[in-house]
Amino acid sequence: MQFQNGSPENTDGRLDKEIRVYDFLDKLRVEYQRVDHEAAMTMEACEAIDRVLGDDTAICKNLFLCNRQETDFYLLLMPGDKPFKTKNLSAQIGSARLSFAKPEYMEKYLDITPGSVSVLGLMNDHEKKVQLLIDEDVLKDPYFGCHPCINTSSLKFSTKDFTDKIIPALDHPPITVKLPLPEEQA
């Protein structure tokens, strides 16, 4: 695995949703690096990719959640080493108990399949059905890493570009949350 700067020169065999991500970033003039790899379905599978992206890059868990009624949807970005406890998040956002949303909602709102969840999928949520939630620790590293809506590539760009260019262009104002570290949980 090695870094490439920007979008792939040859887009043969790449999905339209992946190419739309590169076009979106290029239009925003976001400088980014890309690494292509085997499908990464879990955080464990991402460990080798994490090493390529570097210690200065926030690699997050991206959880697609909903309320019990399946009327409110959330995309939570959180550090990979933090455990997720629904009660900690529910209290902060004033929602009843949250659970993982069904894959069909992920495809409907984000044009993403399980294992490929990415904040960049919000560019496909034209109805603004998904609320972006970001754990404050995600924004502490100088760089941010995510999939381009497909789990066979990973991207790295500056956290400053993420907060100053990408999030505003996604038009999904985030709610910042603080999830406890394992040692802080009772």
Positions of predicted regions on the chain:
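Extended, low-hydrophobicity, polar/charged segments
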Residues: 1-186
